[in-house]
């Protein structure tokens, strides 16, 4: 079964030439919305995803504006309002070493370099300079771990395990 990933939501139309206004959910809009790429529009539940080919992409304020092959006026794209844009897992690009997709990290077990199990990563926050991983502990409050080289020693996405160095004051 194909695993799908949300890259944006069509929130409105823009102009009369078939452009749609998208709130992007991807860290790679230039790659995802590149002219010629295929995206899949997910409308109402129970309907098959509709493949569409991107014919133009530009940014406007906080939105990405897209047009699709075969849809050249506002009346043809009006029905897409509220739909999600997704890509299948095989369309996800390779990342550089030490970079991971959120879905690869969320659900990983976190252990110290001494083998002590701390919990499971449930969420990733992006407050500024670096991401912060939220660790759900079996007992007690959630633990916040900054994703920096001094703390995160190893990430094994195949085994769903992250090994960290516990600095003084971290726990």
Swiss-Prot record:
> Keyword Nucleotide-binding, does the record have it?
no
| All copies of domain PRC barrel, residue ranges | 97-170
Compartments reported by the entry: Cytoplasm
Q: Which InterPro entries match?
A: PRC-brl_dom, PRC_barrel-like_sf, RimM, RimM_N, RimM_N_sf, Transl_B-barrel_sf
Q: Which UniProt key words apply to this protein? A: Chaperone, Cytoplasm, Ribosome biogenesis, rRNA processing
Report the superkingdom from the record.
Answer: Bacteria
Swiss-Prot/TrEMBL GO biological process terms = ribosomal small subunit biogenesis; rRNA processing
General function of this protein: An accessory protein needed during the final step in the assembly of 30S ribosomal subunit, possibly for assembly of the head region. Essential for efficient processing of 16S rRNA. May be needed both before and after RbfA during the maturation of 16S rRNA. It has affinity for free ribosomal 30S subunits but not for 70S ribosomes.
Question: Can you state the subunit structure given in the record?
Answer: Binds ribosomal protein uS19.
Q: What is this protein called?
A: Ribosome maturation factor RimM
Lineage here is:
Bacteria, Bacillati, Bacillota, Bacilli, Bacillales
